[in-house]
C-alpha cells in the first residue's frame, strides 16, 4: 500500500469517527439510554414492603401512618388540626376543603389495593424521554404515575399509554382528560393555595368559575368524573420539602420554595408502592441555555425562573435516592 493510499484510509476513518460522534450527540437521549441502561426483558423481582422500608430511612416512620389522599371523615367528624398552611398543610382552608371532599373520593382502587406487590413507575416530563422507545416498558408497570399536562397521545412509543395516577394543579390542568388519560385514571389535585380548592369545587359542581388568584388562568371547562378526583395529602409535600430538600416549612409569604410535582410524585410512590422506578427526570446543565426541558414542548430552563423550585437541590435529592436503592432509573440521570 502506498503512503498516499494509507493517508486516504486514515482520513476516511477519521471522517467516519466524526460522523459517529456527531450522530451520537445529536441523538443523545437514545444513545445514552441504549448504551448505558439496557432494559431487561424480565421483570425485576418485587418485594412487598421494600419501598416502604427505604422510605422510612429517608422520611422516618411517622409517614407510614398518613393516608395518601385526604378523607372527609378527618375533617367532618373529627376536626383534624393542621399545623401549616398550604401547600404543606390545610390550616385556614378547612371550610373550602370540606366542600371539595364532599363531592370527590379518597379510596385507592381495588385494582391497586389487591396487588400482592405494587410495581410503579413515575414518568417525568424530561426531554430525555424523547426517542427513548420506553413506551412498551412503561405500560408493563402496575401503576404509572404522570405529571401535570404531560401528553400521551402522539408520544406513546416513548412514554407509553397507560396512566394510573396523574398529579396536577389548576394551572397545569390544560390537558384533555378524555384523550390523555384512561377511563380509570385517578386525577390527584396537588393544592398549593386555597384558590386551588375553590377552582376544583366550581369545576366539579358547575358553579360560577373563578378567574383570579392564579399565576396562569386554569381551564374554565374540564370534563372529569368527580369520583375519579382525589386530593393529595399535603403531608407528602411537607416531608418532601423537609426531608429531601431541607426547606423551611414556615416561609415568608414572598418566598415560597417548594418541591416540583415530580419530586412529590416520587415521594408519593415510595409510600404507595413496593417497587419504584423513575423515567424522564433531570434538567439540562444550567449553562445549557438552548436545551429544551420537556419531551413535548420547546421551553428551556429560563421558564423555571421564579417558580420557587430549586432544580439543582432536587437533582441531589434524586441522586441520593438512586444511590441508596430507594428508586431505580430507566433513563440516565
UniProtKB/Swiss-Prot annotation:
Domain of life: Eukaryota
GO cellular component, one term: Golgi cisterna membrane
Main location, first listed in the record: Golgi
Enzyme class: transferase
GO molecular function, one term: beta-galactoside (CMP) alpha-2,3-sialyltransferase activity
Entry's localization field: Golgi apparatus, Golgi stack membrane
Catalytic reaction equation(s): a beta-D-galactosyl-(1->3)-N-acetyl-beta-D-galactosaminyl derivative + CMP-N-acetyl-beta-neuraminate = an N-acetyl-alpha-neuraminyl-(2->3)-beta-D-galactosyl-(1->3)-N-acetyl-beta-D-galactosaminyl derivative + CMP + H(+); a beta-D-galactosyl-(1->3)-N-acetyl-alpha-D-galactosaminyl derivative + CMP-N-acetyl-beta-neuraminate = an N-acetyl-alpha-neuraminyl-(2->3)-beta-D-galactosyl-(1->3)-N-acetyl-alpha-D-galactosaminyl derivative + CMP + H(+); a beta-D-galactosyl-(1->4)-N-acetyl-beta-D-glucosaminyl derivative + CMP-N-acetyl-beta-neuraminate = an N-acetyl-alpha-neuraminyl-(2->3)-beta-D-galactosyl-(1->4)-N-acetyl-beta-D-glucosaminyl derivative + CMP + H(+); a ganglioside GM1 (d18:1(4E)) + CMP-N-acetyl-beta-neuraminate = a ganglioside GD1a (d18:1(4E)) + CMP + H(+)
Cystine crosslinks: 120-273
Topological region Cytoplasmic: 1-8
pH dependence: Optimum pH is 6.4.
Pathway terms, separated by semicolons: Protein modification; protein glycosylation
Biological process (GO), any one: positive regulation of blood coagulation
Positions glycosylated per UniProt: 61, 131, 310, 329
Family: Belongs to the glycosyltransferase 29 family.
Stated name of the protein: CMP-N-acetylneuraminate-beta-galactosamide-alpha-2,3-sialyltransferase 4
Organism placement in taxonomy: Eukaryota, Metazoa, Chordata, Craniata, Vertebrata
Gene of this entry: St3gal4
